[in-house]
């Protein structure tokens, strides 16, 4: 779809959506997004120019269907997949991609750390994906030197970053906000540093006693990104890994640096979103969202969860979806899903489905709460189908039609029950929506209440007996 769109841009020094928007040009990607979001094209251009909206769309990801992340658009959901040294199979990762797209993931991150050829699995995923793909390049940087922090140099990081751009990665998590002076602030935490990328860079800084190379070479990374229209996802290396560590000095010190880096990237006309926690008590979620907006000049916020309790292994997709819904309500632009396997192991395809559905619920709840245009239309349509006992339409409008039908059919599998005016919960005689009270009955009752008062009502026969 995008071949003709990007053909004229190749070879230019800056091909980012922000660059065109700031010149007053509405790109085909912006027009496409405007239609998807039901927004004016001019508003999309203005929001991208301002930095409040991003359209992650690498010029080398030709089969991409452009989408927007920002407070003016619907709340988005990211799904994570990726092979590890202990569990690796490219076909399994492609199956996870298919499931993620099927169940409505808006973006997807390939977090592969080993066990497969990382370039090969990334290329396969990008070629198969209609949604934006994100990566964490420091993983491959470490893998390229066989896990040796001592052999890892600044150029290794930049080489891998550009390779990911060349392959068509739409956004990259760049952990540039973690500074060497932040590391002592981690003392006193229960879980310390829980970001894998942050952990790699912390080890690198402590070994070499040098500043974070992603910070010192940040302008070089901007120069790379603008040639491909790759978007920054500024990583939160010091995100809290438990409730105890939430909103502490270390987290907020890094957030301040992330705000400074956001504005530096914007000077290059490079798109930015900012990553956030993590594990956060419910009463601190609003503070975290507001603080990010303040420090990062309203760049789109992209949060992992947050989990609102630490005692839910096996059910962390539920704990975190609670926090995610709240974060989305307060203005977070994209929610990174958590699966039931969080903290326990590598997710399988079924875990991907469970996590994604939980987060689609959270994102949709946020859209409804923020009164986004058309957000409740599907809810109202399903409610009408429920009132009319149109079971097939209820299944169709569900976030997970297959599961809705499966649960209904466990007790009433015969096709005749798809037209029944009851389910197995209430049976045919006790369903309150099955009572034959008509609008005419209610109008007649209201007339009597208005004329006589409730205490003096005369019994009337319903127009239709129950």
UniProtKB/Swiss-Prot annotation:
Substrate binds at residues 80, 109, 139, 175, 195-197, 236-239, 275, 302. Its cofactor is [4Fe-4S] cluster. HAMAP family: ThiC. InterPro entries: ThiC, ThiC/Bza_core_dom, ThiC/BzaA/B. PANTHER family: PHOSPHOMETHYLPYRIMIDINE SYNTHASE, CHLOROPLASTIC (PTHR30557:SF1), THIAMINE BIOSYNTHESIS PROTEIN THIC (PTHR30557). Pfam families: ThiC_Rad_SAM (PF01964). GO terms for biological process: thiamine biosynthetic process; thiamine diphosphate biosynthetic process. It comes from Prochlorococcus marinus (strain NATL1A). [4Fe-4S] cluster binds at residues 423, 426, 431. The gene is thiC. This is Phosphomethylpyrimidine synthase. The lineage of its organism: Bacteria, Bacillati, Cyanobacteriota, Cyanophyceae, Synechococcales.
